[in-house]
A protein has these predicted regions:
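Interfacial segments of alpha-helical transmembrane regions
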Residues: 3-18, 75-99
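Structural signal for membrane-spanning alpha-helices in multi-pass inner-membrane proteins
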Residues: 24, 70-77, 104, 154-158
Length: 164
């Protein structure tokens, strides 16, 4: 039998992964396409604004909190490897930590920082914006897929542990 605190932790991780998957999915299928249809100076300015507004307490709590909980789940899954569902829990935690959190920190955030330093009306704006759109969106697709897969793996682990 698993402890209620571990169940709550695992559920919170799955829920957080699902929230992040939804956010990234919307950017991949709607927001970035809409921004690509407007002129580069306006697109750059809009994305700069989005990048500033999204750094709010609720987003940061879900994004960073899910990473912290996934780190704890990875550790407990290794320590409790003999339990049903441990491999799924570890896989889900690692998918989020590597495919969502690390991808964000290593790829999307530096791209956002470079865009933030740009002047929307500069002569290089069109090239910068085209490069940003393709590269940032590709990495966002990775985050969308891995956060969804992390949620599914965590839910599978929860299900298997509930069955015993």
């Amino acid at each position: 039998m698993i402890e209620p605190a571990l169940v709550a932790l695992r559920f919170a991780a799955a829920f957080g992964c699902g929230l992040m998957a939804g956010l990234f999915f919307v950017f991949s299928v709607a927001v970035m396409g809409a921004l690509a249809r407007i002129q580069p100076p306006e697109g750059i300015a809009a994305m700069q604004s989005i990048n500033r507004v999204i750094l709010n307490p609720l987003f940061l709590t879900v994004f960073l909190g899910t990473a912290l909980v996934c780190f704890l789940i990875a550790l407990t899954s290794l320590w409790r490897w003999h339990e049903a569902g441990a491999a799924w829990l570890l896989a889900g935690a690692l998918l989020y930590l590597v495919g969502t959190f690390l991808v964000t920190m290593l790829f999307n955030v530096p791209l956002n920082n470079a865009l933030d330093a740009a002047t929307p009306a500069s002569p290089d704006a069109a090239r910068l914006w085209a490069d940003y759109l393709s590269t940032w969106t590709a990495w966002n697709h990775v985050r969308s897929i891995t956060s969804f897969a992390a949620m599914a793996a965590l839910m599978a682990g929860l299900y298997l542990q509930a069955r015993g």
